Amino acid sequence: MARFFRRRKYCRFTAEGVKEIDYKDLNTLRNYVTETGKIVPSRITGTSARYQRQLARAIKRARYLALLPYTDRH
């Protein structure tokens, strides 16, 4: 029987040595937002707790400044 092997999740920001997540980096932020506009949880993405907090803060700032939409209907 073939067993399904699940890849280990890792934090991309830790691997790349990112110090601070920038709210103006929309290409990165869009990878962590669903089509409906929700922030993807760290258990799905594998992001560490520290960077998940920075990511949420950056996404909320980008939404407030109208760089990212709150929902998909805009």
Curated annotation (Swiss-Prot):
Coiled coil: none annotated. Pfam families: Ribosomal_S18. The keyword Amino-acid biosynthesis does not apply. InterPro entries: Ribosomal_bS18, Ribosomal_bS18_CS, Ribosomal_bS18_sf. One of its GO terms (molecular function) is structural constituent of ribosome. One of its GO terms (biological process) is translation. Keywords: Ribonucleoprotein, Ribosomal protein, RNA-binding, rRNA-binding. Gene3D superfamilies: Ribosomal protein S18. The keyword Ribosomal protein applies. Disulfide bonds: none annotated. One of its GO terms (cellular component) is cytosolic small ribosomal subunit. Binds as a heterodimer with protein bS6 to the central domain of the 16S rRNA, where it helps stabilize the platform of the 30S subunit. Belongs to the bacterial ribosomal protein bS18 family. PANTHER family: 30S RIBOSOMAL PROTEIN S18, SMALL RIBOSOMAL SUBUNIT PROTEIN BS18M. Part of the 30S ribosomal subunit. Forms a tight heterodimer with protein bS6. This is Small ribosomal subunit protein bS18. It comes from Alkalilimnicola ehrlichii (strain ATCC BAA-1101 / DSM 17681 / MLHE-1).
